[in-house]
Amino acid sequence: SECLVGSEMCIRDSIKVRRFVRYEGVCSAYVHGGGTHGILVNFETTNGIEAKDEFATYGKDIAMQVAAANPGYVDEASVPAEVVAKEKEIMLAQMAGDPKTANKPEAVKQKMIEGKIKKFFKENCLVDQEFVKDGDLTVAQYTAKVAKDLGGDIKIVKFTRFQKGEGLEKRADDFAAEVASMVK
């Protein structure tokens, strides 16, 4: 609160905090593209490796990954069962509507769905994604490599990605009513 008041006095404008997140423990923050995205990633570490400069670089790399790839979840375990069920339902409907797959045996369809669900996890789970700075590694492999190099363990616990303007309601004013209210 005091920080906001001080900032308001300095820039002479009202500041309203519309959304925020607070994590305990080891975190890395990153602001991307002139403020278009803000990312906060929370980690669990061992052996005090979070104090090393290499960990700060690693944390920024992971936050940049979140900014670039926009994952929805940390790992497969964090994906709600309802989301997986809904994805399977969509895939079954697509197969039923496709003449190439509609007449395939149920066992074949289930294998196809398993493959598509693995692809869904690879695209939507941070640790399963291809690491943007090195396409030969996944984020999990990069994390394991950095942890080994630093002599400890690293676990990505959670992350938050804010996008500029996200969640802000646009006011829809009736121009005629606005003019009428000014005239009165």
Where are the regions that the model predicts?
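N-terminal assembly/interaction segments in proteins that build large macromolecular machines
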Residues: S1, S7-K184
